[in-house]
Amino acid sequence: MKLGVLGSTGSVGSQTLQVYENFRDEIELVGILANRASEKLLQQAKKYKPKYVVSYQEPAKEWLESLPEGVKYLKGDEGLKAIIEESERLMNAISGIYGIKPAYEVIKAGKTLLASNKESILCLGEIIRKNRERVIPVDSEHNALFQLLSSVKREEVKHVYLTASGGPFKDKSLEELKTASVEEALRHPRWNMGAKITIDSATLMNKGFEMLEAHFLFDFPIENIKVVIHPQSFVHGILELIDNSFLMHTSQTDMKIPIMHALFYPKRKEYPFKKVSLLELSPITFEKVDTTKFKAIDLAKWAGFMGGVYIPVLVGADEEAVNLFLNKKIGFLDIVDLIEQALSEVNIKDPQSVEEILEAVEWGRQKVREIYERKYAGKG
């Protein structure tokens, strides 16, 4: 199987390469791509020796001279095109909104998209829905649902449940959240992830996103997709069937498990990393989501019901609001407040092309920045 890894230096991209290392005899690594020509990308090129290494930032002369023999450097879109053309499966592990266009190019080329980038699933929703047979979700929750849904008839499923750990603020009061720091928000209790998705996990916006993703990936009505707090993060997806039975997918909190499933589907491979026993996957408890404290889920659901331009605006607004919080410009609760206000001011038409989708995302970013300058800048 010929594999391309887009966003190779991030968390999921790096773990994909760890999986590849254990299956070199079955996988040909066509190329790795990252935004920056960083030391990490160079070390990956040396260790894994792909055919192509690609960055959007111009590398230094010394960096290029350090590439191992047989590894070809390509810049930007030229490199992306080469990797897509020569790969069969492409892991889209690019972080944030920058993963949207590459996902579209993979689908347009008729290749299999291993979808880890949330924003691309959301913004390309209808395109994803029409090409579902060539999209394998990598996110642990959607990968779990992908597996569960293959074992039942669609008409037998009453509800789909996504599980949320609750993040670092599950037991904090609304009053305490007013003064929550960036450092506290980045301490996820279960998963080791990048900064953006960790903050989305703290606000529970990631679960709002995941509801909409499940809607597009599996063609389920939004109202039939539920979120439940599961602090242990052992259960990744649940189906409630019409006979009142529940099917659950359970595994340790290790992204290499869904990565392996997506790489080798429909086959399964022996897991080559540290395993846990069933007894270690306990206890398992579930709790109701406090939507008065975590407004992001209902806000995302509303954007999903509105559809059209509202979803890419939501994505762009979230990107900018999280960035403002990470840079300590706003408070934790301001993240969702800014997004909500941006959505309330939408006055642009529904996008008809990928270019217009990207413009709507950028509109959401700029609108949040504008509201911030209007209401928050200069405070304190």
Swiss-Prot record:
Protein family: Belongs to the DXR family.
InterPro entries membership: DXP_reductoisomerase, DXP_reductoisomerase_C, DXP_reductoisomerase_N, DXPR_C, DXPR_C_sf, NAD(P)-bd_dom_sf
Protein name: 1-deoxy-D-xylulose 5-phosphate reductoisomerase
Reactions catalysed, as given in the entry: 2-C-methyl-D-erythritol 4-phosphate + NADP(+) = 1-deoxy-D-xylulose 5-phosphate + NADPH + H(+)
Enzyme Commission number(s) from the entry: 1.1.1.267
Residues engaged in binding Mn(2+): D139, E141, E210
Residues reported to bind NADPH: T9, G10, S11, V12, R36, N117, E119, G194
Protein encoded by which gene: dxr
NCBIfam families the record matches: Dxr
Residues that hold 1-deoxy-D-xylulose 5-phosphate according to the record: K118, S140, E141, S165, H188, S201, N206, K207, E210
Pathway it works in: Isoprenoid biosynthesis; isopentenyl diphosphate biosynthesis via DXP pathway; isopentenyl diphosphate from 1-deoxy-D-xylulose 5-phosphate: step 1/6
Pfam families in alphabetical order: DXP_redisom_C, DXP_reductoisom, DXPR_C
Gene3D superfamilies: 1.10.1740.10, NAD(P)-binding Rossmann-like Domain
Record keywords: Isoprene biosynthesis, Manganese, Metal-binding, NADP, Oxidoreductase
Protein's job: Catalyzes the NADPH-dependent rearrangement and reduction of 1-deoxy-D-xylulose-5-phosphate (DXP) to 2-C-methyl-D-erythritol 4-phosphate (MEP).
GO annotation, biological process: isopentenyl diphosphate biosynthetic process, methylerythritol 4-phosphate pathway involved in terpenoid biosynthetic process
GO molecular function, one term: 1-deoxy-D-xylulose-5-phosphate reductoisomerase activity
Cofactor list: Mg(2+); Mn(2+)
